[in-house]
Regions:
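Short, thiol/selenol-centered motifs that function as redox-active sites or metal-ligating centers
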Residues: 1, 14-28, 47-49, 131-134, ...
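A short beta-strand-turn-helix
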Residues: 1-10, 141-148
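Short active-site neighborhood of thiol/selenol oxidoreductases, capturing the structured segment around
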Residues: 3-23, 42, 112
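Loop/turn elements at helix/coil->beta-strand transitions in domains of secreted/extracellular proteins
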Residues: 7-10, 36-41, 64-66, 85-86, ...
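Structural microenvironment flanking redox-active thiols in thiol-disulfide oxidoreductases
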Residues: 18-62, 72-78
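Short, internal strand/loop/helix patches
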Residues: 58-85, 89-91, 97-98
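Aromatic- and Gly/Pro-enriched helix-to-coil junctions and flexible linker segments
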Residues: 123-232
Length: 232
């Protein structure tokens, strides 16, 4: 989000093939027409669709010119707290805080106006009534360090993150992984690690790619967010 600190607000709304809330889409289009020079506006596919060509075709068919972020792991959607298809988020890229979460028609424009005016903004949260966005978060409510996390570290990280390795620190114990867990979450979410990642959704498949699977990313990030617990 810091990449958009030259804008005074960022507005994000969920989008899915045949599941997008019509009122939300209309409100986002109106916001784009009025604020596109001052506000960054995005649609977010919360892991509902993997076919990017189909998403692009639906946008073109409906004459929508908003960019779509593909949240294949659903993790960004979770962190923004978007749970229904009619909920949008208005984000302040300077303070890194959410100013508004709720239906686009109820308060998004007011939040944008407040940010444009430079006013101090406190979070306004209004429950949406649209279709619930499915999530597998409950499947990872009791992750085991031994069975779920350590194998991912061993397979994808430990070759470099070991004593004498080329990485700046070793992941050679559960305590070390716990201590570095906030950094692990950051570099996994931003895809800086594992190094040399390739967008495997574009072009031909490439052998020996370094990417984590969506499931591995979900487990690591959700484990860290749960406090990085270790099996007793």
């Amino acid at each position: 989000m810091a990449w958009y600190d030259d804008h005074q607000a960022v507005v994000i709304a969920p989008f899915g093939l045949s599941t997008t809330d019509a009122g939300t889409l209309s409100a986002m289009t109106a916001l784009q027409a009025r604020y596109q020079d001052q506000v960054a506006l995005f649609l977010l596919n919360p892991g509902l669709d993997s076919d990017r060509d189909a998403v692009a075709a639906e946008l073109a068919a409906n004459h929508i010119e908003l960019p779509v972020l593909m949240d294949d792991t659903h993790l960004v959607t979770e962190m923004l707290g978007i749970g229904r298809m009619d909920e949008v988020v208005v984000y302040d890229p300077t303070s890194f805080e959410i100013a508004y979460r709720g239906p686009a028609q109820s308060g998004a424009e007011d939040a944008v106006e407040a940010l444009l005016a430079g006013s101090d903004v406190e979070l306004v949260s209004i429950a949406g009534t649209g279709s619930a966005i499915p999530s597998n978060e409950s499947e990872h409510s009791e992750l085991s360090y031994v069975n779920d996390i350590a194998p991912i570290i061993a397979e994808n990280c430990a070759q470099c993150h070991r004593e004498g390795g080329i990485a700046p620190f070793a992941m050679d114990s559960s305590l070390a992984v716990q201590g570095w867990s906030p950094m692990i979450r950051e570099v996994v979410m931003t895809k800086r690690m594992p190094p040399g990642q390739i967008d495997n959704k574009v072009g031909q498949k490439i052998k020996n790619e370094m990417n984590l699977t969506d499931s591995e990313m979900q487990k690591l990030v959700r484990w860290v967010s749960a406090g990085a617990p270790v099996d007793v």
